[in-house]
């Protein structure tokens, strides 16, 4: 298992090995309502959002799930948001063949179909109105040092989750271009 303790929000963190069926990601924290009215956990691949899980609190009290490729959003899938202001949560993303099984505090929230290959995921992004205590990863081989530098094949996710963020673009020869 690999754990990231007290990551900043917003931030993006490398997932050093490819996702596969059996991989699990757990994000533990609590809801805050500072200047944001929602928070998101995203699985990222270069300029693409492979999985967007957005907890909304202001107008629609929902969890919206989606994907985004080259700035174009797919069809949004909505579910009831089980969280309220200051609630503690454990968001679990379990990778299965063909879908992500997503639960909150041990309760099934949704199954979201893979719209892009899970092998394309490079990072997890956190942004919005949440304090995150830890992110934990299990079900990987852990054959590399997850704390070392990572070559994304692009400039990385600098300033992810801020107004100045510009999504990175894969280098022309990078193998991940084949996924999109």
Curated annotation (Swiss-Prot):
Q: Which domain of life is it from?
A: Eukaryota
Molecular function (GO) terms for this protein are: carbohydrate binding; galactoside binding; glycolipid binding
Please give the Gene3D superfamilies that the UniProt record associates with this protein.
2.60.120.200
One GO BP annotation of this record: endoplasmic reticulum unfolded protein response
Pfam families on file: Gal-bind_lectin
| Residue ranges annotated for the Galectin domain, each copy included | 11-138
GO CC, alphabetical? cytoplasmic vesicle
Enumerate the CDD domains for this protein: GLECT (cd00070)
Which keywords does the record carry? Lectin
Parts forming coiled coils: none
Keyword Ion transport attributed: no
Keyword Plastid attributed: no
Q: What is this protein called?
A: Probable galaptin lec-8
- Organism of derivation: Caenorhabditis elegans
The opening ranks of the lineage are: Eukaryota, Metazoa, Ecdysozoa, Nematoda, Chromadorea
Q: Which gene encodes it?
A: lec-8
């Amino acid at each position: 298992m690999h754990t990231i303790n007290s990551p900043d929000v917003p931030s993006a963190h490398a997932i050093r090995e490819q996702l596969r069926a059996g991989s699990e990601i757990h994000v533990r924290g609590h809801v805050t309502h500072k200047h944001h009215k929602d928070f998101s956990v995203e699985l990222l691949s270069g300029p693409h959002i492979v999985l967007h899980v957005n907890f909304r609190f202001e107008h629609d009290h929902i969890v919206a799930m989606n994907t985004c490729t080259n700035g174009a959003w797919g069809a949004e899938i909505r579910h009831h948001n089980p969280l309220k202001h200051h609630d503690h949560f454990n968001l679990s993303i379990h990778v299965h063949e063909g879908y992500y099984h997503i639960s909150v505090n041990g309760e099934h929230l949704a199954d979201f179909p893979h719209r892009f290959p899970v092998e394309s995921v490079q990072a997890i992004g956190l942004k919005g109105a949440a304090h995150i205590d830890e992110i934990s990863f299990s079900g990987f081989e852990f054959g590399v040092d997850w704390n070392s530098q990572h070559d994304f094949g692009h400039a990385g996710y600098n300033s992810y989750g801020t107004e100045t963020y510009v999504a990175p673009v894969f280098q022309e020869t990078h193998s991940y271009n084949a996924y999109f």
